[in-house]
Structure formats: C-alpha cells, structure tokens
C-alpha cells in the first residue's frame, strides 16, 4: 500500500495495559514515517470513526506516548458498540469509507476483545464489499483471556496478578479474625463465560503458603450442597476459607446466579452481584459469619500492581500490528505463542481474524480440579508465568504519575452522522 494515514481505537472494557498496546502502535508507526503518515485515534472507539471524532496523536510528545506504557485504562476512550452486518446497516460501512477517504486512512488498528475482532474483521472486508482498500489489524486485549489461538490475552496477566495478590492478602486478614469473627471471605471477579480470572485466585495458595481457596467457575455448574460441604471442610480444617467466584457462575437451571435480566450493548447478560448471593447461601447453610467484596473496575485498572510479562506482551502486540500492516497483511491479529514454561519463553505469531472473531476460549477441563473447586498443577503451570515480574509506574507525591494526553481533535471535513 502507498503512503497512508492510520486509524487506531480502543474497544470494550479497558485494562491496566491497553495503553501499552497503544504505545506500541504509535511508537512503531512513528518509526515508519515513510509508510505511515498521521495516526488518528478514534475518540471512544469505533464511534469516533463513525462520528468523525478523531484525535491527532501527532500532537503528543514522544515522552507522553512513552508514558502510556505505564498508564492504565483507555487514553482515547473506549466503547461497547458492535457494527452490524453490511446487510443490516450498510450506511455505517459507507460512512466509514467516507471518513477513511476524507482523512486518507489506509490502515485500521482496533484494540479489543472478541466482539472487537468481529468489528475489525468486517472493516477488513471493505475492499471486497465496497471497493475501498484498507488493511485492518486487530490488536488483542481482554481481561477475560478468552480469545482463541493466542496463548494468553494482554490485560489478563495483570488482572490475574491482582486477584492472586488480593486473595492472598484478604485470606491473611480473615485468618487473623477467624477465631472470634469472620470465617469466610467471598471475592467476586469478572468472567462472563470463562473462568480464567477466577482461576487466578488459586495462585494465592502455594506449597510455602497454604491457603484454603474455593473457586466457583462458570464452566462448572453450581451445586449448592457440594459447595457448602467444601466450605465447611475448609473452615473445620483451617478455621477460615476464601471463596473466589466468577460473575458468570450458573445454577442447575442454566441461569446466572447473578442474572437480573439486563443486557449490555453487545447483547450479553449484564452481570454482577453474585458475591452477596453466595454469601447468603453460606449464611443460611452453615451459619458462618462472612464478608464479601467485588473486585469490579479495581481488578482491571490496577496498573500499580501490573504483571511485567503482561506489559511487555501488550506492547509487543501493538508493535507487531503495525509491522504486519506495513508488510501488507490484512484481516489478521498478532498472537502470543508460548515456547516453553521453564524457563518461560514466548514469541509473536499471527492468526487470521476469521478464526478469531466470535470464538470464545473456555478453561480446559484439565485445568479444573476433580472436585470442581480448584486449579490443577497444569493450570498453575500455565498461569504462573503470566503474573511474574513487577513493572511499577513512576510515583509523585505518593501516587502513581499517570499521563493524560492532550487529545487534540482533528478538524472535521464531513457532515454530522447520527448513530
């Protein structure tokens, strides 16, 4: 492709390291100024492209772009907006082409999870469907760790580290209080269908620091009697117990324990609130005193405790996306390929978006213990390297010194567009 500008945007739930991927994209694009001109970021994801709300990243200093590597969440704003098919909403695709033509955009980098991969796939097909040449590369990101093909997903390692550390620390706390007060602590974590984040709670216990952790996975149907028996055994043996429960746990009726009938913009069940449900089950069934907490945004925003492995992989995915684009690739996603566990080694691979979009990677059965409440040695071997290493941000006056970009708007050239 001839010299063209590029579009970059962030989509879906943000993470502690998605900005590291942005830094990888922007710094690498600047290193290839003979092939890529300006990089325009979409304000609030693909919505920024549709509404021509573009950000001129060239207005940012090299130092500001570099600081994205240690700044959490989405520097350009994100969105939960999924493009419908060309047949269902042709006007949106025609609008994208208008925007791309008006701003001479030939490269499209979309940083997100499974639904974002679907959006990127649709954009990558514009050359065939509407005759506009574009190279669309998906930059992987999801704390849920449920994208296929790639060994792991940027964003997950840092959430896993946060959950493992929080579970260990909270367990120390409840152990201190268990003689005369709290016996059980319940931590609710993200994970609609895949239990990867919940599994990370199992890392809190190790041979040199044994902790009674009971995990409730979305992949394992919740059995109240078995669960209560497990908690009861743990409390009788250790005096206390910690429970890590995924928001996506389902009962025997197939419904989410926490389903309130709400849906998000992607049509997924809007979950949350399973921790108090589980807490009441423990109270009613065992009569134990409990405390519960919800990790919620804290787990995905905690850049101060990010995994160094995760930060490095996130940056590498952004860098590879640009390199793949200028090499002529389209409709692909850079992936993380695990080469060995001990020592942990990985490299960058490539996957076709047609094999990624709308596919969820569940926890394999061999990663879940026979009783359904813990992780296996194989799971521990998989997870452990992903939380290794510290990559602390700089601090100022006792707080992390995160960057806020100027986010200078690009002048609009087209008429207003209603979503």
Kindly give the residue locations of the regions a language model identified.
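N-terminal phosphate-binding or glycine-rich loops at protein starts, especially the Walker A/P-loop
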Residues: 1-53
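Gly-rich Lys/Arg/Thr-decorated short loops/hinges at beta-loop-alpha junctions or inter-strand turns
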Residues: 2-9, 68-82, 141-151, 182, ...
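Short, ordered loop/turn segments at secondary-structure junctions
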Residues: 11-13, 42-47, 80-81, 113-114, ...
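Short glycine/serine/threonine-rich phosphate/pyrophosphate-binding segments
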Residues: 15-25, 49-50, 91-94, 114-122, ...
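Glycine-rich oxoanion-binding loops at beta->alpha junctions
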Residues: 52-106, 115-116, 143, 168
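Accessory alpha-helical/coil subdomains and C-terminal extensions
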Residues: 99, 107-112, 120-130, 137, ...
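C-terminal non-catalytic interaction/assembly regions of soluble proteins
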Residues: 256-419
